[in-house]
Amino acid sequence: MSNSPPSSSSSGKGLSIPRKLALNAINEIQNRSNDYLLSKRGGKGLEEGRKRAALAAVISTVSSVGADRLTKADFDELRDLSEQESHDKVHFMDKLTNKLLDAIPRRSDESMDELRKRLEDRHRVEQPGLSIKRISRNFKTLSSKMDLVFSLQYSIIHVISWDKPSLTLTFLILYTWGCLMPYLFLVYPVFYVLTGVLIPNYLYRHPLAKPDIIPTRARGDSSIFGFLRTENAWELDRQRILLERSRTLERILSQELELSTISSRTSTDSEDEGSSSLFYEVFTADSKSNLVFKAVLEEDEETTEKGRTGVVDKVKLLINMRDLQNLTSDIIKMMTRMQDSIYENYSFKDEKRSTKHFFNLIALILITIVLGPYIPWRAIFIITVWVLILLKHPNRQHILKQLKPATKHKLPPKHRTEVKRRASRLGELIVDDPPQYRTIQIYQIEKQDLIKPSVYELYMYSSSIFNESDTLRIQKKDPRGLPISHWCKLPAQAGNSRKRIGQWTPIRDPGASKTVSWMRWRLTESGHMTSPASIVVAVLCVRLSDTAGHQKSDRGSTMIPEPVRRKAV
């Protein structure tokens, strides 16, 4: 950002004294902001870079208001904002926005009052300030977690448009039952968790044996309600457009993956990022902030009324951007906690815990269906909401202390141990399922040295064997892969795919043979080999006899390593 404000009269010729003071104050704020940013660039001060872009919008807004309306005392106070910023709880942008609203003529406008109330809200003051880098990272993270929302959206569209008549009729039947028996609306979510989360995760951990059946061509309609399916021209055209769109998206994604195989690892959700990830975030934040604030600065040119209306719209835009940023942060935290809870409790990571949840959900469904007509649901809903709201009262701790009894009735030690022993018996489960392993092959591709033909150097780790029949090798292209095995990730179906291979610790495999040609790494969830669904990563050495064009044939793998196991940290 240049040190001159974005005004056509920045040269200073023909300006009044208050306007000159205004320009000097704005320049002073800019210089202090830039000096503060440069002094903090080496550490955590990188987060303060958001004020540079925000200051551009504020300068444009102050200029459009008219600096003649501000007094010298106001400019002195604005000059001191950057110094008081780290000591005051009120954000830098909020202070400037309040001064901006004070400079606008007093009129009975509901939008102005609403903006003031939002700025002075104590809950809003406690939230983080506006940061283009943060909001861009939130949108990127949120877009990767919206699969469930999008699948729900398309499911609703399929139900309404009769794309799947059986699904539409099932929805109508379930909705009718829910209207006749309202307590079933509590059963439906539990039933979805049971059939849509628990059972698929169990089948993934314990796959069923598929019988060898000769495949035959499907005859007739796939559903008995096929005559209800709509096959008009509009529907066929919509399906054709969706198919072309999906193919185009796959082609674009494949091209992006070819170009950004290694750089994609900088996409992370953590706040404490490395230098490469931080560079990626700053670069994307700068490009997005330029687009956003360019639209803010050009808004005056598009509006017919360049006075007070344009200023209010700009202030409202900044406030809404900050609220949207904090809203997306809360949504991401909530979705992350939900995913972690589902993975810990319902993915059969711990067989006993997930099995207990399975039986508890079945018992809850049966009890609700059988005893549902006799349960006072209205009283339960009323009391539940009242209790939840009262528990959020600021003086709840004082009230709860008064309600607690002064002396607690404690059981004797013998009775206490007996109760614990009976409770532990009720929760005992025996899981006798044999361990099952899935193999993931990672090929260690090596190059032959030109000077010493007997020496091979590591080239990369790849998911493709890169043999003579490989498409890339036929086209005389380099294989796709990663130079370091620590960057290799598990597939998404492996559960917690955030753990990389390099984060596993090796332990000896006493039962394995010493003459195998694969290096096997087994991923267990709890640190030992009792998990029924472990991951085996097989690393097979592939040696290339030519380093330039990969024209010659592969030599046989002579890599016979000691088998090791790797378990999750």
Swiss-Prot record:
Q: What is its main location?
A: membrane
Q: Which GO terms describe its biological process?
A: peroxisome organization
InterPro entries assigned to the protein according to its UniProt record, in alphabetical order: Peroxisomal_Membrane_PEX28-32 (IPR052816), TECPR1-like_DysF (IPR010482)
Give the UniProt keywords, A-Z: Endoplasmic reticulum, Glycoprotein, Membrane, Peroxisome, Transmembrane, Transmembrane helix
| Pfam families assigned to the protein according to its UniProt record, in alphabetical order | Pex24p
* A GO CC annotation given for this chain: peroxisomal membrane
Where found?
Peroxisome membrane; Endoplasmic reticulum membrane
Membrane topology designation:
Multi-pass membrane protein
Ranges for the region named Disordered are 549-569
* Residue ranges crossing the lipid bilayer per the database entry: 179-199, 357-377
Output the PANTHER family linked to this UniProt entry.
PEROXISOMAL MEMBRANE PROTEIN PEX28, PEROXISOMAL MEMBRANE PROTEIN PEX29
Q: What does this protein do?
A: With PEX32, contributes to tethering of peroxisomes to the endoplasmic reticulum for organelle biogenesis, positioning and segregation.
Protein family (similarity comment):
Belongs to the PEX28-32 family. Peroxin-28 subfamily.
The name this protein goes by in its record: Peroxisomal membrane protein PEX24
What are the leading ranks of the lineage? Eukaryota, Fungi, Dikarya, Ascomycota, Saccharomycotina
